[in-house]
Amino acid sequence: MKRQRRRHTPKPRQSPAALERLHPHAAGIDCGSAEHFVAVPPDRDSTPVQSFPTFTADLHRLADWLTACRITHVAMEATGVYWIPVFEILDARGFQVILVNARHVKNLPGRKSDVSDCEWLRDLHILGLLRGSFRPADGIVALRGYLRHRTTLIESAGALVQRMQKALVQMNLQLPLVVSDITGVTGLRILRDIVAGQRDPQHLARHRDYRCHASEAEIVAALVGNYRPEHLFALQQNLELFDVYQGQLTACDVAVEAHLATLAATITPPPASLPVARRRQKPRNNEPRFDVRTPLHQLTGVDLSQIDGIGPYNALRLLSEIGTDMTRWPSDKHFTSWLTLAPQNKISGGRLLSSRTQPSKNRAAAIFRMAAMNLGRTQTALGAFYRRVAFRIGKAKAITATARKLAILVYRTLKDHLVYVDPGADAYDAKDRTRVVRRLRQRAEHLGFGLVNLSTGEVVEGAVS
């Protein structure tokens, strides 16, 4: 007999007789690179739609006009970075400004213009049909700006490393084959000596660090190549630029450390003492060289690095994206939905057509996914969960499921000030075995059979530990 698919019957909603005007003093702004179009209710001005250039003086004039029109709420689309100056000015002037996703406010086809867009935003906001995008507090926004700029510096330095590798390969210097990282101790010593004019492979191989896996003879064989002036010139310039970016990274770390100290100083009273780190390790490549755990603990009152997969640097990046106030999301389900780590159910005809997660460029979600990917190789409860899900439905979905579980742990830790204690992979496997045995016993009883332990010959009647 063919199994019937489960039908989803959503609860019917009662339509109101008329939409209520929740924000009668609302305006809509369509942001552009050269000018902003602003719409206020028609009864507030003889010209309810006006345009303002993007110069600072004109933005203040825009705020003055909204004040004269008795506007209290403002809605605008997230258009590139053009919205940031007007958002900050209006927010500082006391307006309740929300930033909305452009996909959520699409107008009807054939009605796309700057004037109609700002009027559409105004009408939707007056009726309370718009939901503002998340934007953390100003202090966290500044921290986010520093760390996003730091990520840009790292990516730019990475592009320079690729160009140096290209120059080496063009000269048939196979240094990347014998050195895992050409910007490590051994690699940089050899590169600087090559740029300085040294060509003898025996001399260059003496720069080998004792921790390098390749032998000195292997390095000598890799450094016999065809030195050409154009490739040496490219190698020299890229190496000099790489050093510049490393200096910029150091300066950026100083700014981040100072800003963290400023944020932590505003917390009163100070939290309890910092717990002992679960594991002691040196900062990895591209991670800050200063103490990150102490100011983060002062800022949040908890130590997120106690959670498996969330090291100090990941905790810093997460807080710069989500902030410290978890009350912005009513529950962990709202939080994971905002991260696009929750299923997006598509139901038609009473049937569930798809439950895939929504594609997104959410930076916090990317951090959770990367942490989940690394957890698969650990002997922790989260690692055991990842391996169980990966065996059942594949690695891609296991990464999403583990990232969602990590996000819930971070949410509850920050909101309720909980302390995470890892039960270990063995405890998780034992709990999972108990759950599987219980389901097997229930299934056997439903079919009129019993479940017997082959090693002892006893009938399984209850949960097995």
Task: Indicate where each model-derived feature is located.
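A detector of single, family-specific signature residues
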Residues: 1-465
